[in-house]
């Protein structure tokens, strides 16, 4: 499940929220315990959010202190046909967890500070430990985000107690939330990363569910992120195609070969549909992000499309037919065997 964040101390960006749900995002993270937010204001906008999406299938992950989980709070949630998960940041106890579960709600614990002692105690005392999920912190202040190693160790610890646990982690968005405006990542190394690169690193540590921490992510990146998380699919933006005789290759979906090499991304499907001889032209140096097609000099490889990941010298048998834009170059390191990809022209990417 991939999610985004909505903060309640300011008017809702309803158009953005609806676009994200339409894109396929199914979870919303929000908090009712941010100190600088007025209580009356945040509960007003929380109600507006619930009403806005009352006909959508959405799971809400609500960051809350057990002290504010009153009967009236639970009664308010029951008015809506939605899934609610309460994240306890601190003050974790068996009693607090059981009180949440007794209301028919799921409970989420702070994965960043979880300990073996707490997990052991919960595993022994809870009726159904598998109902717990876990969510890491985000870190607004630069240089305070977690290391890859620490996140990996915390996740490994959780999986020892429940191999199928849901573990959430945060990545940075586009409109960086105040007051620091430095991004809200779980892992410090991803503070300035493309969202897909950040999501991939989280997944490699064992995080199963990715959340955008900041209050907004640009729509094209939002689409790239959901496509990656749900389908392992990549849409790459290119400058105009240099060779119009191979435009058919840019109107189709490609699958990466299962034995894909290190320096290039090979399309498994491109050679199968080569409709004509491809003459040698544009046989220039292959830069990172160059899209190439083998010409007739390469015999049975004629028509094979590749995307270059490391700078390669010019070759008489290889035509350079397009170039991926700078903003999408980080995605090349994320593409793996059996993934799929397609292309958009620059003018289409800006729509």
Swiss-Prot record:
Major subcellular site: cytoplasm
Primary enzyme class: hydrolase
Pathway: Cell wall biogenesis; peptidoglycan recycling
Cellular component terms (Gene Ontology): cytoplasm
Catalysed transformations (reactions): 6-phospho-N-acetyl-beta-D-muramate-(1->4)-N-acetyl-D-glucosamine + H2O = N-acetyl-D-muramate 6-phosphate + N-acetyl-D-glucosamine
GO terms for biological process, alphabetical: peptidoglycan turnover
Family indicated by similarity: Belongs to the glycosyl hydrolase 170 family.
Name assigned to this protein: 6-phospho-N-acetylmuramidase
